[in-house]
Amino acid sequence: MKRPSFSVLANARHAPEIVACFRETEQWLPVTLAYLGLRPIVYPYELQLRTGEVAIFRERTDLVIFWMVFARRHYPVRSSEQVIIDVGANIGLFTLFSARQAPRARILAVEPFPDTRSSLLNLIERNGLSGRVTVSDCAVAASSGTAVMDAAVGVPSQYRRIYAAATTTLNARHRGSPALLQTAEGVPVCAKTLAELLDTVNVATADLVKMNIHGSEYEVLMSAPAAALQRCGRIALQYHELPADLHLGKKELFEHLGRSGFRLVSDRDTQRGSGVALLILDRS
């Protein structure tokens, strides 16, 4: 068996992220080794940040999301931002990150799945953020009403999604075979359009909208009128690859947002069916 120190050196491409993890927490070594698959940690795992915040990882995917948000800085947050919307908040790791990075921001965390939302609320309360963070229990969709979410046992919380035939095979490796059998009989949740969600924060515009909703980003953003989209200053978007026969992908999505005045600033495509893009509204 390889010693962890030598195995870490073999992962030199992760060096900047490892340094970032070191800066975030005194527990950087066990977290790094677990992320790299070199030495597992036992879940639930409590993580204390150097800045005082606490997060609880209940499964490996929580650790991966922590790494994406805090070490890789998937979603950039400006300190000057006043209103941030976290669509697909999950257990709240980006909410926690953005609250620290933008200390004057009000945050709307959107998480419709009941069990996951309970973890989100616990994280918010434990870190003293109840005065700054509002939690919405509605999914964001093309139309308001009721939607249905994954109910299959064993699906990691980060991969639960609104039921739609077009997204059945998304993240199949992570979601497991039970999720592939999902029908429209899942967990019913309320649904709001993007415009209705923006009305929730009771301001003209949101400085940043982060969105990771596992394939639903296409219907949400492409159905939204320009007037609603233009209430978003920046969109940090995790996009997913849909089946080829739909003829709908990131190109069409970026073009649609471009027609509403958005400029693509960065696009990190994993070449494995997903990517993260940052788009900024050009108000000139």
State where each predicted segment sits:
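Phosphate/nucleotide-binding beta-alpha loop and adjacent structural elements of enzyme active sites
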Residues: M1-S284
